[in-house]
Amino acid sequence: MMEESGIETTPPGTPPPNPAGLAATAMSSTPVPLAATSSFSSPNVSSMESFPPLAYSTPQPPLPPVRPSAPLPFVPPPAVPSVPPLVTSMPPPVSPSTAAAFGNPPVSHFPPSTSAPNTLLPAPPSGPPISGFSVGSTYDITRGHAGRAPQTPLMPSFSAPSGTGLLPTPITQQASLTSLAQGTGTTSAITFPEEQEDPRITRGQDEASAGGIWGFIKGVAGNPMVKSVLDKTKHSVESMITTLDPGMAPYIKSGGELDIVVTSNKEVKVAAVRDAFQEVFGLAVVVGEAGQSNIAPQPVGYAAGLKGAQERIDSLRRTGVIHEKQTAVSVENFIAELLPDKWFDIGCLVVEDPVHGIHLETFTQATPVPLEFVQQAQSLTPQDYNLRWSGLLVTVGEVLEKSLLNVSRTDWHMAFTGMSRRQMIYSAARAIAGMYKQRLPPRTV
């Protein structure tokens, strides 16, 4: 049957013919058979181009002739210029049935290849194949076996992974004719799909990771809970530093837009006011300047205490020690008889801010003073003392220092109440700092 169809087969033991001879034979074919010519002029060429050329690693039984759906018209062959023959062998004529089989292969026997690239295939030779194999640039060894498994077990089949929008770049290994001539065996172009990273995905992942890092930092910075934890940690560190070295407190919290001058150079007053305002405002620059009260050393009554505190501020402004617009805080202690024969020591605090027109007064808690110590201070003051209208010449602290052991004139409150004068001034200063903050415009807070 193969002889009737005009197909010559090569036995398995027969070595493949020399490709040089094949090329020479193809070039020497001067007359073109009618069947081959009509097959190329048939409109079924497009269907043939969509299938790769068939090749067999082992002899296969020939396909039964398939009759075309319509008779092929007779087309006279065109005039072909005469070429000197290189060899004397000529291919046998091809029958119309065989030409039709080669010109219109059945679709059901040859599924389309998914691994071969979608390119136009070269035209087949004018004559029928004269061997059991052929070489194609896009041939896939896993295809073309009429639906059966490949005959070469050493060649595994590869299928390209399916991905949306991602096509791996196939690497096509071309077989050279030199290796074929040396008898290495049947070679063909085998498509090995190689999965490569899409640069779009890599770039997107890099941007996402970078964006994720920055987004995490921004989210942490704007998280109220994290901010609260950081503030508490900062406060704990500052507290530890100031506990180990109390002298570091003015340097840690010094700064900001709030600048305050205390009208005294005594540390008991300056430190108390500094701690209070830095506690309320966070950062504040607080310094002390000695100011004159121009009243008696021991003021008596609320009016005298308020007068002494205000006079300290005015004296610094008159002498040019502080600017006319400078915010100042003044502290003045006085004694007052709140009840019959009941005397108390009280501190008066004044805050004056000319820029914002703020003027505030407050008082510390009252510390009881025994009557005998007040009477001693009154007896030590001359009757013709020019400042007797405002108070006494001798302070209560001086009398207590002389009368009691281990009592300081500047901080005798600890001995009588267990609370230092600095703590009393701090409590009142913190209250007046809160009132001052409430009256400031929002932009300056």
Curated annotation (Swiss-Prot):
It comes from the Eukaryota. Gene3D superfamilies: 3.90.950.10. It comes from Homo sapiens (Human). InterPro entries: ITPase-like_fam, NTPase/PRRC1, PRRC1. It holds the Pfam family NTPase_I-T. This is Protein PRRC1. May act as a regulator of the protein kinase A (PKA) activity during embryonic development. Residues 1-71, 105-167 are annotated as: Disordered.
